[in-house]
Amino acid sequence: MGDVNSKTVYFTAPRQVELREEPLPALGTDDVLVETICSAVSAGTEMLVYQGRFPRDLETDSFISGLRGGFEYPLAYGYACVGIIRETGKQVDRSLRDKSVFAFQPHTSHFILQPSSLILLPDGFSPETACFLP
């Protein structure tokens, strides 16, 4: 797939959102590249971030790799997305390619993770339904 840019939603200030294009790092030998198909929007936490009413003294979520750090602008946020594995690192089973997965990731078009951070979805499971797994 070569060099990949990801388009990510950033909350930049209260009631301000923008789409930023950023290059992804090189795929590691133990990683997979996922193309996002859909992501769910939280009417709770994400609305607080959008409105600027989030707790600035708390971490976003240290258990989700894409959300490490504090609540401060600019902030890429979101934590429920479904995608398809498009590339596998050299140490990853190639049979994972084209498999549908759930991931705790911000709203972004592409991301890189290790397979152990993904939930493989059964064949025929709709992406829209899978977004509500958490």
Residue ranges and their predicted role:
Residues 38, 99-101, 110:
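Residue-level marker of beta-strand positions
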Residues 21-23, 112, 120:
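Generic structural detector for well-ordered beta-strands
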Residues 75-104:
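A glycine-/small-residue-rich N-terminal strand-loop-strand element
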